[in-house]
């Protein structure tokens, strides 16, 4: 009864449901965890279908925070702040009154450490000078609609395989920021990630009741429709996002400002991910 009351308070209307989904996902840094929990609550009869859909919509918004954290990590070494945070967290954990805060900081620090390690691994791979990788991406026409669909499917399959849209987003940012992958293909991968991440909740709902399966399916349909309307205005929408961030998507590699311009690529991907989910 107490859990039912808490969930009911968090989802009294659509706005509070969306806000709850956003905050929970921002805290746990996993939209998959939020959607799977939501589906299980529907299966247990603790949430209605309408309440679950609002929470899932919020989860889509909350997951964009991870993209912004990762994009910021490309501007400075995020791991420099991790070790002091670990130290502070350990002190707080041994304090009875602030143990919960310490546990929270400790968990967030581990997440940042993982993101920093993933970023550094990508840099150490030196993909910008890996000829087979360069040849593979160069074989695609960046202006072709077929290429966009291909990378959308690649993004979906990769996310389904690794079960983490954040990991695929980090890989996409690394490929784009090193100049290996053009921005249009990178954004197509991000769109695919938004579809691939919905598979987990649908798998979790296979043995659930009808309402839970509908909640999981609503997540997939919602994201697929989002991708379809973006495809209709693909390039104008990207130009709009690039203009907002201040990125010149037409700049050539021999331009003296190319490196400074490429540094904004991770922010373009994060901005697109946010506007797409909003």
Residue ranges, per PLM feature:
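Helix-loop-helix hairpins and the membrane-proximal interhelical loops
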Residues: 1-14, 18, 105-157, 175
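Interfacial helix-loop-helix linkers and transmembrane-helix boundary segments
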Residues: 1-9, 49, 97-104, 208-218
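Alpha-helical transmembrane segments of multi-pass inner-membrane proteins
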Residues: 16, 20, 53-54, 98, ...
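Hydrophobic core segments of alpha-helical transmembrane domains in multi-pass membrane transport
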Residues: 21-25, 85-95, 107-118, 152-159, ...
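Membrane-interfacial helix-loop connectors
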Residues: 25-28, 34-60, 68-80, 85, ...
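Signature of multi-pass transmembrane helix bundles
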Residues: 50-58, 64, 68-119, 128, ...
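Alpha-helical transmembrane segments of multipass membrane proteins
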Residues: 66, 162, 166, 197-200, ...
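Transmembrane alpha-helical segments and their short flanking loops
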Residues: 115, 122-123, 127-142, 206-278
